[in-house]
Amino acid sequence: MEPDLPYPSYHDYMRNCSSQIASISYRQLTDVELRQFQSFCLNQSTDKTFSNVHIITRINGQEIRFDPHSVTGCLFIDDVYLCTSSGFVNYGSDIVLPSMIRNSTLRNCYVFPNCHISQNALIENTIIQTNSIVMGCGRITCCKHSLFGNGVICNMGNETGGLQIPITADLLYNDLEDATSMKPPPLDPSYLDDIRGDYCVIGPNAAVEMCSLIDSTVIGPFAHVVSSHIVNSSVLSSHCNPTKVTSGDIIDSILQWGTVFESGSNCAQSLLCEHTTTSCNAKIVNSIIAPNTGVSSGECNSSLVGPFIGFHHNSVLISALWFYGKGNIGYGANIGSNHTGRLPDQECLPGEGMFFGLGCNIKYPCNMLKAPYSLIASGITLLPQKVEMPFSLINKPSVNDSSVSPAYK
């Protein structure tokens, strides 16, 4: 992911990361550095000779300097490739942290120049790229042959086997038009082979703080991840569109550029497209959230949520394919409120610009694709039906007194 591009290619970034590792030249610690490591810097290793600690001298042909005094109080397990030098790392807009590795356990890692790594319980099978910050974390690890959330099947609509799309980090919402109109083609095996890896990646200028577990995850450049739990996922980010994750729980999912995911929210088997927002304990499962849509407080399950939708209240959206978006969901709306007593084999197709009022109940099956920009009044229970009247107000029947003008009632 080129940091200067607004939406850089994830596929290219993973390939470049692999080639960068392949280009590394390294050496062993000198006798002077070894004495400093053991006595002055108080480092330890499972190998008493520290032969498992390798000092990076070149990356992509560029010579790298090493300062042994910047590595203190660490434990090294298996092969660790280091390159630290005196300097500073930007932390936010007005704070800088010293470049160093301190009080951390590292196992089978690559640490690139000018990083701040401190107070971490265990970092293993991880690539930490230039100008990154990793501090106060529990465990950062990676499984063998991980795909980082790519290829996970997202089942939307009919929960017994509806619209099934394998999500990938480079899947844009415009690309979904073909995928939703026909059975999606299988994934290109070469795409998955190119991104498959054995290492977590923390991209350049990224910051990871106080996370209990980061497992089999790619964190893109300029991303900021705080107090979160992330497993088998990818967090895309760039200098122009940084992604921020705070107090989140993310499993088998992909967050694209500019996403804000915070306030105790959680998602699983989902794709959050660029510039989506998730907050206030929102729950997202088996769903695709289109660009510029916000999910807050509510539950979204097995749904395709189109662009520019306001979903900011305690409400429920289940098994809905809202292709064109641009609508709103009011407080207490239950979209998918009935159950047949059998399998959950029904779905809803809202039209563009639909407005679901406070406390409405939408029973399935429901098709409103040909009723764009219609309003469901507050407290209405909409029985299973197909609506084909655009710009409608759907309300309960009212009784008029012929002797009084309706305007005065």
PLM regions and their residue ranges:
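Active-site pocket-lining segments that scaffold enzyme catalytic pockets across diverse folds
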Residues: 202, 218
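Glycine-rich hexapeptide-repeat left-handed beta-helix
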Residues: 3-13, 64, 69-71, 75, ...
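Intrinsically disordered, low-structural-confidence terminal and linker regions
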Residues: 1-31
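Residue-level signal for inorganic ion chemistry
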Residues: 109, 217
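Short, T/G/N/S-enriched strand-turn elements that build extracellular solenoid repeat scaffolds
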Residues: 98-100, 117, 204-209
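An extended acidic
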Residues: 25-27, 32-66
